[in-house]
Regions:
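Tryptophan-centric aromatic hotspots in well-structured domains and transmembrane helices
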Residues: 31, 61-68, 89, 148
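Residues within well-ordered alpha helices
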Residues: 32-36, 83, 140
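Catalytic core of soluble alpha/beta enzymes
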Residues: 94-196
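N-terminal small/glycine-rich loop or linker at the start of catalytic domains
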Residues: 43-72, 107, 116, 169
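Catalytic domains of carbohydrate-active enzymes, especially glycoside hydrolases
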Residues: 80-95
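Metal- or metallocofactor-binding catalytic centers and their adjacent structured scaffolds
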Residues: 1-37
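Short secondary-structure capping/junction motifs at helix and strand boundaries
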Residues: 35-45
Length: 196
């Protein structure tokens, strides 16, 4: 905390761009150094600092894939998903928005045939949708039991997310491209985020 206070002293609010990347890089280096000095794995040190000292040995991970590779087609996509399952993943995330809505729905349905119907598929638009497109996708995605609908629009477009939450009742994930506490706080306050 002291290092953050020093690095952010006299800084204006916000956290975009080079400053947040530089501070984040220094922050990671400091944690790595402290871990080495303490002769403890970083996960243990963080658990002691911010938890009860007993790190959770089970960490949720998912496989991210389902990109729009040239010549892949539906068979290639389902083969890719099967490989993730063979590696032990139970949840898979695939991209959407790189094809038409109808084509994306075909791809989703093909993946769901491999994964099964029980919320094991997340989809990620990488922030590319305007409000109308995000809602059009939401209406169609509501037909599937998805793990989440990720980054439908720009994460700083709080109005888009707030309105979208009125049209999509499943879990919505966003915020990985926010770089400040203020942005994360405003996302929670103004973007219609729900606890799910």
């Amino acid at each position: 905390k002291k290092m953050w206070d020093i690095m952010m002293k006299n800084e204006k609010p916000g956290g975009h761009g080079e400053r947040s990347v530089a501070v984040g890089t220094i922050d990671m280096a400091i944690w790595d150094l402290v871990s080495k000095i303490e002769e403890k794995p970083l996960y243990q040190l963080l658990s002691e600092q911010y938890g009860n000292g007993n790190p959770n040995r089970d960490v949720f991970v998912y496989a991210a894939g389902g990109y729009y590779w040239p010549e892949q087609g539906i068979v290639g996509l389902t083969d890719e998903i099967k490989k993730y399952l063979d590696l032990g993943y139970s949840v898979v995330k695939k991209k959407i928005g790189g094809a038409s809505l109808a084509e994306d729905c075909k791809r989703i349905e093909a993946v769901l045939k491999v994964l099964g119907p029980n919320d094991r598929l997340a989809v990620d638009a990488n922030g590319r949708f305007d409000l109308k497109t995000a809602i059009d996708y939401a209406k169609n995605l509501s037909n599937y039991n998805l793990f989440w609908y990720e980054e439908p629009g720009d994460p700083l477009d709080f109005e888009l997310h707030k309105e979208l939450s009125n049209h999509y009742l499943g879990p919505i994930a966003t915020g990985e491209n926010l770089f400040s506490m203020q942005d994360a706080r405003n996302l929670i306050r103004y973007a219609g985020m729900r606890k799910d």
